[in-house]
């Protein structure tokens, strides 16, 4: 059997996958088994608020009454480099026990264990962790005198008789068992005796422009290691990010869905409570979660905080282990060293590693030795044509490539390179052209930065996939496989999972699975429209044109930060005639036909899901009615639909004013019978942010009048600022068009009302009560 496996890599891979599927889950991830385990104490609240670097685990499926039993907790294990080491852990307050029902057999128990005191300034921590099966003690670890906020590796071999009980004996100390995994001995033996497992490394280079990489046509060999790997890969010739800065881009390619459609918006760093509610409240497939559920060990090594939930910036995607270095400049070598340690330690098991290097990102501070190499590669006559920041950027790209080369050499030394899938991409590019220097509203200037524009130099990134040799052999390709035409990073997750036969059925991944067409030697689908989000802006790119749109309230731009402001709500570029995007055709009549086509394509594709604030303005019952309404939303205004009789002006990203003048309409709707829907009296204000609440004030002929809200038409004399629970109605409220007062409701088309069937039934009773109290007037 071992000889067959040695010479049959495809058979071996299938066997490993079959073992994973037939034996419940191998390795056994105790965090994911928590929901079926018995716990001595249910822990539904945060017992240690003084240690704020933590959050309840988001992937274990625990009920609210037990949610803190799984804690994603971070220890600052090296304060000099701001090293935040976060693990998905099982939480043990003093005296806590957990009992798991598991298949009988021999296992390797593996974990990282950390301690905290019950009190913040407690001088010492201590306790004993005991492992039992059927009342028989398997292992005991004494933590007397252990250091706080440090991770300690604990492994042991155990033979289970159908259960595993973990007992924490302590008077005043908390225990966190991070990444607790049980590896079946037979499964490990299969991996050792057969070929190396197929592991996956996703290398994300922050701010990597495609056109500064040799594989994409840069004339000088600044990135030799990346270029060599590209020759062995599925190579996307013209790939684009779906976000022009890190957060919306990485969230989109990890989930194969646009950031705003995940509930996260695109405007700023923070992730607000309601955005978290929408994100965590729906089924969300992502790379870390899918690999973990398939039995892979999952880790991120990075210098950004977007995968750390406690920061209020990031989210918990379900990694076993997150290693984040916050110190800039020195971080790259530290992260690479840790990645080398990781691939060495985990060489015998399948893993998914997200390796994120921040190096090319500003402030462009390459080591002198890398600048020296770049100077030797590029002739002076060409090198000095670049401005100083671009020269340093080239040094950073060489430094990044050098570090990636170190990791690749270690994989080859370990004998794991051939069967490791390696993906190289960038989260976005970087803007260098002075012609594109528009500064808008945020903390960084546009030039030598990103996040403000949608020109190709800011969103055109490298993207290629080095396949395991056994997969290459299976599909009969021995050289680079090129994907022509434009593509997007929305395809990244379904494509790499497709090659590994791990794409879940009925998944939420939206992008193209290129693995299918490559394996079947059929023409690959064309990504006709590529949509990209920016801060309060968006774009759609085809092979022929680029259309850019800014949200209302964000249409004023400046040429350089000190320049004169001017309005530029739209941009349009003919990419066939103007590939450098220098002539904005939206400003004159020359591009009118193309502009109408681009707008229509943009509307018809419906890239984003949106909530609709629906506003009913009642008919005028006086000789003349001058209606005015001021309104602000918690997120940002995306667009609106209004009849010609209504004038709308935006005061900022979050506020608009509505003005309507009408003459007497007495008799037109005088019947007690409710008329058909009259769109001429309805305004729809759309938002992509998931927050439902808003602020309104309505006057008719200078007099403030009450407004009705939500499904019940609750009437308020004064404007309100927090009406989330009252304003939502997933259908048109009863009596809307017969109302003599303005009526506002949020259709929750994106966020949803979040009501259960029980809550809906309760709502009927609430409506009756409110009617008897006089709050609802049909």
Regions found by a protein language model. Name each.
Residues 10-11, 496:
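Signature aromatic-anchored transmembrane alpha helix within multi-pass, membrane-resident enzymes
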Residues 83-94:
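Non-catalytic, glycine-rich low-complexity segments
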Residues 18-77, 92-103, 107-110, 114-128, ...:
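Catalytic domains that recognize anionic headgroups
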Residues 2-10:
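Sec-dependent signal peptide recognition
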Residues 1-2, 111:
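Generic recognition of well-ordered secondary-structure surfaces with a strong bias
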Residues 13-17:
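Hydrophobic core
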